[in-house]
Swiss-Prot record:
Subunit and partners: Homodimer.
Name of the protein in its database record: Succinyl-diaminopimelate desuccinylase
Known pathway: Amino-acid biosynthesis; L-lysine biosynthesis via DAP pathway; LL-2,6-diaminopimelate from (S)-tetrahydrodipicolinate (succinylase route): step 3/3
Catalytic reaction equation(s): N-succinyl-(2S,6S)-2,6-diaminopimelate + H2O = (2S,6S)-2,6-diaminopimelate + succinate
Domain of life: Bacteria
Annotated GO MF terms: acetylornithine deacetylase activity; cobalt ion binding; succinyl-diaminopimelate desuccinylase activity; zinc ion binding
Record: active site: D68, E133
Disulfide bonds: none
Binding site residues for Zn(2+) 2: D99, E134, H348
Source organism of the structure: Xanthomonas oryzae pv. oryzae (strain PXO99A)
Signal sequence region: none
EC number(s) stated in the UniProt entry for this protein: 3.5.1.18
Length: 376
C-alpha cells in the first residue's frame, strides 16, 4: 500500500459514527504538526473540530472535510466489517471511504507534500475538519464559522472534499448548493365519528386544498446552474388507525431545496401567508439547515475546471446538485467555495467503496489545485 491508502485505512478503522471523532483528528493533527502546521483543537459541545494552518496572510485557502461517518446499518449486510478496511479487486471497502475519509487522507498527504516543496508559499494553507457534518451540524463548522467571524478570520477559497464525482474522478465540479428548509405543519381539527361528520372537523379535508396549492406552486425557474426550487412532502400522519374515527389532528413534514432567488425568511413568510389564506387552525415549526451558496466565475472555479479537466480527460460538468455540505457555512464568510472528491455512487450505502486508483490519484489532484492557487 502507499501513504494515502494506509492513512485512509487507519481512519476507516476508527469507528467515528457522528458526532464521534474516535481519534481521527488527533492522528491527522500529529501528521500536520510534523509537517509544520500550527494545529488548534476546538472542542465545541460534544464535537471535535481541528483548525490547522501553514503560512500567513492572504490569500487563505481552506481544505474542508469531516471525520464523522453515518452509521453502517446492519453489519451482517456488509460483505466485510464496515470498520475493517478491505481491498478486493482494486476497490477499497469501508464506512466513510468515499464520504469522506479518503478525501481527508488525501488532503493531509497533499498538504504535507505541498509544504515540503514550497516552504515559503504565498498566503495561508489551512485544513478544517469536524466530527459534526453527518448529524445535526450544530457544533461543527457552523460554530467554527461564527468563531472565525469573531476573530476576523478571512477565507478566500475553500475546497470541500465531498464525493462529487459521478462516474470517474474529476468528472464533476460542484460550484454551489441549494439551500435547505424543513417545516412541520400541524393542522387542528375536531375528532369524531365518521357517521357524524357535522359534529367533527376533519383536518385532512381542511388542509387538502392548501397542500395542493403548496405542492403545485412553481417557486422559480432555476438560477444559473441551479435546478428550480422544489418543495417535497416527506411525511403525513393523521388518525388513530381505525376507519370509523375522523382524526383530530394532521401532521405534515416537508422540505424545500431552494435557489439563491430565495432565503429562508422569505420562504417562511410566503408559506405562512398561503396557509393563512386557507383559514386553517395550524402550528408551523421550521428548521433551517443552510442557505444556498454559489461560486461565480473566478480564479478558484477556473483553476479547478482546468485541473479536473486534465485529470478526467474532459472538462468537468459544473453542478449545484446534491444535498447540503459544510461549505454552506464557509461561503457566507465571503469565500469562493467548490467541492471536489471521489465518485459518490456508494455513499451512505452498504459496502461503501472507492477505486484504489482514484484514491491514489486524489493527493496529486489536491496538490495541483493548491499549487495553482498559492504558488503561481
Amino acid at each position: 500500500m502507499n501513504d494515502v491508502l494506509d492513512l485512509t485505512c487507519d481512519l476507516i478503522a476508527r469507528a467515528s459514527v457522528t458526532p464521534e471523532d474516535a481519534g481521527c483528528q488527533a492522528l491527522l493533527a500529529g501528521r500536520l504538526t510534523a509537517a509544520g502546521f500550527a494545529c488548534e483543537h476546538l472542542r465545541l459541545g460534544e464535537v471535535d473540530n481541528l483548525w490547522a494552518t501553514h503560512g500567513s496572510g492572504a490569500p487563505v485557502l481552506v481544505l474542508l472535510g469531516h471525520t464523522d461517518v453515518v452509521p453502517p446499518g446492519p453489519r451482517e449486510a456488509w460483505t466485510s466489517d464496515p470498520f475493517d478496511p478491505q481491498i478486493r479487486d482494486g476497490v477499497l471497502y469501508g464506512r466513510g471511504v468515499a464520504d469522506m475519509k479518503g478525501s481527508v487522507a488525501a488532503f493531509v498527504v497533499a498538504a504535507e507534500q505541498f509544504v515540503a516543496a514550497h516552504r515559503a508559499h504565498a498566503g495561508t494553507l489551512a485544513v478544517l475538519l469536524t466530527s459534526d457534518e453527518e448529524g445535526d451540524a450544530i457544533d461543527g463548522v457552523r460554530r467554527v464559522a461564527n468563531l472565525f467571524r469573531e476573530r476576523g478570520q478571512a477565507i478566500d477559497w475553500c475546497i470541500t472534499g465531498e464525493p462529487s464525482s459521478t462516474e470517474r474522478l474529476g468528472d464533476l465540479l460542484r460550484v454551489g448548493r441549494r439551500g435547505s428548509l424543513s417545516g412541520t405543519l400541524t393542522v387542528k381539527g375536531v375528532q369524531g365519528h365518521v357517521a357524524y361528520p357535522h359534529k367533527a372537523r376533519n383536518p385532512i379535508h381542511l388542509a387538502a386544498p392548501a397542500l395542493a396549492e403548496l405542492v403545485a406552486r412553481q417557486w422559480d425557474d432555476g438560477f444559473e446552474s441551479f435546478p428550480p426550487t422544489s418543495l417535497q412532502v416527506s411525511n403525513i400522519h393523521a388518525g388513530t388507525g381505525a376507519n370509523n374515527v375522523i382524526p383530530g389532528e394532521l401532521q405534515v413534514a416537508f422540505n424545500l431545496r431552494y435557489t439563491p432567488h430565495w432565503d429562508a425568511p422569505r420562504l417562511e413568510t410566503e408559506i405562512t401567508a398561503l396557509l393563512d389564506r386557507h383559514a386553517l387552525d395550524y402550528a408551523l415549526r421550521w428548521h433551517r439547515s443552510g442557505e444556498p451558496f454559489y461560486t461565480p466565475e473566478g480564479r478558484l472555479r477556473s483553476v479547478a475546471r482546468e485541473v479536473l479537466g486534465a485529470f478526467a480527460g474532459a472538462p468537468p460538468e459544473e453542478s449545484t446538485g446534491g444535498g447540503t455540505s459544510d461549505a454552506r457555512f464557509i461561503a457566507p464568510l465571503g469565500a469562493q467555495c467548490i467541492e471536489v472528491g471521489p465518485v459518490n455512487a456508494s455513499i451512505h450505502q452498504v459496502d461503501e467503496h472507492v477505486r484504489v486508483a482514484d484514491l491514489q490519484a486524489l493527493p496529486a489532484l489536491y496538490r495541483t489545485l493548491i499549487e495553482r492557487l498559492l504558488v503561481e
